[in-house]
Amino acid sequence: MALYPRLDDLLELRHQARTLGLASHHLVNSSFSGLYASVFRGTGLDFEEVREYHEGDDIRNMDWKVTARTNSPHLKTFREERERSVLLCIDQGPHMSFGTRGTFKSIQAARTAALLGWAANSLNDRVGGLLFGGQANSAHHFRPTKDRRALWRLLKALSGPIEGIEPAKDPLLNALQRAERGTATGSLIFVIADLNREITSLEATIGRLSQRHSLVLVPIDDKADRDLPDLGRALFTDHAGNLVEIETGDESGRDSYRTAWEQTRQFLAGVANRLRIPLIPVSTDEDVHQSLMRGMRQARRLQ
């Protein structure tokens, strides 16, 4: 099984992006096109008109004055601002070369970035990328632009490994700090990464980013992150690059492993909830398009 997707497959995802809710210039109250705008607040909406309510419309946009005057439900409709900058921060560390069901994390991360990138590009937004974790002491940066050829170059980079080795210091923290320094205020930033790790060291940077930007966390998960299979004694590599031997046949050990994962995810969810950051997990055994749609619907209900 390949560790990375074919470039042609990432290019084909532009067709699915049309139904994701980002790539529509229709009024944003319709069931799909309204989803993205209503979840990722702070991108800016321009008032369009008042019209009659249709089934499936977002009732939070009801115009109660017109409804009372006409004795018929009406709501305000909006269009998104003409453009914004979207930055896709994508984890390409060695831990992304992992997957026990469906496919590898690296492939799901690339598919996620492709769907979001195509959708944003179709809205005439500036799309850029920050690929981290695969090159010593640096990250590959793609400046946000509306040029579709630049998006093609980003997707091409995602269709293969980044040359180099994992840096000793925290590559995700470095990427977030680089995004903090180099991204225009008011941008929409997606962090597409393996977040099954210690989060405390990231909390302050995530908080500062969320104050200046619309931030979205997309953890790339595998079932084995939570439920360790019985493989006997096995060697694993942690996020620091250290080899760790685990006796996976021990039921109590697997329970401790599951508890540790749950505590880590609960802490991440708590940070996201406190900072009002959407948290949209994507698993290796799920369809990326469906995962994003489900995650956005859940995030909207929590707003």
List the predicted regions and their residue ranges:
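N-terminal juxtadomain amphipathic helix
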Residues: I59-N61
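A positional/architectural concept
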Residues: F40-G44
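Exposed, interaction-prone extracellular/peripheral surfaces
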Residues: M1-Y36, E52-D57, V66, N71, ...
